[in-house]
């Protein structure tokens, strides 16, 4: 990928990758820590990737030609709260790299943007 996708296409592409039987997911350490901290599980991430929506513009990823997208969704384990997942898709590899997972209601109260977080670690 060399050009970022708009929100609608990003939603469709991420959902398509997430539903592909060849899907491979990697989790950055930060994402694994946030999942544990928030009491969320892998199936919550999969649900959000398969059924969520991208509403925000992407940010460049550290991997050249790739971009970070935030996909948002309520999940079976999140109660009435929505989660946001910052993900770097690699369509040709059928790979989704999870950078972080957040509660959107907490994110909206904090200055700054997690989508700007580095996806290196």
Regions found by a protein language model. Give the residues of each.
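Ribonuclease/tRNase effector modules and their secretory precursors
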Residues: 1-121
């Amino acid at each position: 990928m060399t050009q970022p996708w708009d929100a609608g296409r990003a939603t469709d592409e991420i959902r398509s990758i997430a539903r592909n039987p060849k899907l491979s997911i990697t989790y950055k350490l930060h994402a694994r820590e946030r999942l544990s901290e928030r009491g969320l599980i892998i199936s919550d991430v999969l649900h959000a990737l398969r059924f969520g929506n991208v509403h925000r513009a992407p940010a460049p990823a550290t991997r050249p030609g790739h971009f970070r997208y935030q996909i948002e969704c309520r999940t079976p384990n999140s109660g009435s709260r929505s989660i946001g997942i910052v993900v770097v898709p690699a369509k040709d590899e059928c790979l989704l790299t999870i950078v972080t997972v957040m509660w959107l209601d907490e994110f909206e109260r904090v200055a700054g943007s997690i989508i700007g977080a580095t996806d290196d670690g």
